[in-house]
Amino acid sequence: MEIERESSERGSISWRASAAHDQDAKKLDADDQLLMKEPAWKRFLAHVGPGFMVSLAYLDPGNLETDLQAGANHRYELLWVILIGLIFALIIQSLAANLGVVTGRHLAEICKSEYPKFVKIFLWLLAELAVIAADIPEVIGTAFAFNILFHIPVWVGVLITGTSTLLLLGLQKYGVRKLEFLISMLVFVMAACFFGELSIVKPPAKEVMKGLFIPRLNGDGATADAIALLGALVMPHNLFLHSALVLSRKTPASVRGIKDGCRFFLYESGFALFVALLINIAVVSVSGTACSSANLSQEDADKCANLSLDTSSFLLKNVLGKSSAIVYGVALLASGQSSTITGTYAGQYIMQGFLDIRMRKWLRNLMTRTIAIAPSLIVSIIGGSRGAGRLIIIASMILSFELPFALIPLLKFSSSKSKMGPHKNSIYIIVFSWFLGLLIIGINMYFLSTSFVGWLIHNDLPKYANVLVGAAVFPFMLVYIVAVVYLTIRKDSVVTFVADSSLAAVVDAEKADAGDLAVDDDEPLPYRDDLADIPLPR
């Protein structure tokens, strides 16, 4: 097995303390000064990349599936979930980027140094499970694409996905940037199709605006669909990924350099997620308008009743005519493959950060994909396309329930003076992010408990079987609650931000509560060579 172990264990002291002894500090500091003299737009372009790579996760097959079903089942009533979800995603993605810029380490590495061994292993397993859960919609979406393009059974397409992404990763050495550009363009081809269809079906603007700004959960399954939407939008592994991707950029370690880096990554993420918001709104609106049309044929009405990725190409007939299925299939294939690449990198950084293990990308992809294929293959054989579509919703709900175990550490670390120094979150960001975070966590816990209790009451199992199931599941629910509370109330014990005395007086004067924490304006942010092989333009 091709595994590389890092030669030494990282200490708990930040890179700013160790960099002071670097023999090349003066040379790198001069490079920093040259970087800071460049025009702002050039420095911004140097930071472009991580946000757009992360935003691909908001256009993956899981998002498309939940968007299509939300529109078909509830028209525009759940658009507010997408709006709140992407606003929250922008906040936490920017916090993840800030964490990487300020500390020079990504979220998984900081979790490893902060938590006890048992907790660290627990968080690592949950993070790996999140990557696998995120990969399931990509496996099924790609299988649906093969079914649409080549008319092969879905379960055969699931097997093919085990090698398709490996081939794509292998082709990167022949032109990574061109390959990524091609994939992105194919994904946006589908976006353009939905925008074109949107201009034809013309959904009522008033209803769309009401759906965006008036929260409603009417009708059967609205709560489950809303949680699935959140799970598809706010993915735990994306937080690990974004905090690592920013380390591939050479950000000067001066006060201005750090602030500029955080600001540039915020602008880039904001633009990328705004585009993702528009695309998600377009998909929901097209689905809601087309499936509620008075002129809908009986065949299309039957498809709307059980809408899934493999039956949605008819929504684009007005734009593409007979070729709608082919274009939709190609775009769906691109969506699944591009999202899988980001998932592969996220899994690599999670393993490297928690365990200090670096695995070859093809091996990492093979491991994740093999595990993700198993449930997809079983469900597609037994339940066919309909069962596979339901599995996507279940995977999205799993992601939503796993969110606290990446979100709470991120919120605590980015708000901690010992981790971020004077760059920690403002009180407004702390209050708003914790409010939304705890709200989502509370909704998930409420839905989990009420859904399970309702299932126990109304299922057809014998009473003794219900007792056994309840006795097995309720302890896990208790462990879930205890784990969330533990992560929330536990105090940070490891300092990752070490001040330099040369600027302590300045920072103390500007910020009375900064204590002895300051920013070393002379030491360069270490370029992470171990994270530099990311396929992004520099």
UniProtKB/Swiss-Prot annotation:
Belongs to the NRAMP (TC 2.A.55) family. One of its GO terms (cellular component) is plasma membrane. This is Metal transporter Nramp5. Keywords: Ion transport, Iron, Iron transport, Membrane, Transmembrane, Transmembrane helix, Transport. The lineage of its organism: Eukaryota, Viridiplantae, Streptophyta, Embryophyta, Tracheophyta. Residues 518-538 are annotated as: Disordered. It comes from Oryza sativa subsp. japonica. One of its GO terms (biological process) is manganese ion transport. It holds the Pfam family Nramp. It is found in: Membrane. It comes from the Eukaryota. The chain crosses the membrane at residues 44-64, 77-97, 118-138, 140-160, 181-201, 227-247, 264-284, 324-346, 365-385, 391-411, 427-447, 467-487. NCBIfam families: nramp (TIGR01197), Nramp_1 (NF037982), PRK00701.1 (NF001923). Its main location: membrane. It is a multi-pass membrane protein.
